[in-house]
């Protein structure tokens, strides 16, 4: 605690203290573009050394909750620039969290009301997302049945993340955090229960982690590895995630792979509220 309020160098980024505000989904952006109220919200919290934003969908397809601000077009850049300027004016630093929910979405949120996408076709049933109910009102609904991505579509999503990372830096962010936790699209590919693919993104641990690692590498190439972080929730059970065969080996392999990449940081989220999954020693 004696060092909590002392400066810290985060991969070349000077933080005024070691307090970090974790990302929190707010669903307060009615037109999906951040406004002055969003800027005020983050500026009020800029006394922390580092802020991590709420999840920002990298595409319309990646959205799983109403009123979440995106980062995939020029209008988003203009809106988020107000936020970064407000935070920097208070001496704060801020990373943008890049997000694709995969199967954790609903047809009412998808372009053309089509099925959300995932590694496979297993529906998340013991959970809800914030979308439009049958009456057209905002509320909790069970995620829709997903469809499995084609191989070329997986690569397109990787490109979406890289594009959004570039836009985030253009908007003035100090870096980006890839959301690979909490049962969203990367968790869906890592799970051998959900990922039954037979292409280069399914089967072995090496193949199931390929999507995440290719995305990390693409984002790092786009904006520089010192501006890139990743959030993981090993052995998480939130959003209808279940144990799967080879789970220990999967997370061990991810750890080894990340150790070879000089990222800004790795953000781990432990979910004791949601699960009592046994964790391996160490």
Give names to the regions the model predicted.
Residues 1-282:
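Flavin-dependent oxidoreductase catalytic cores
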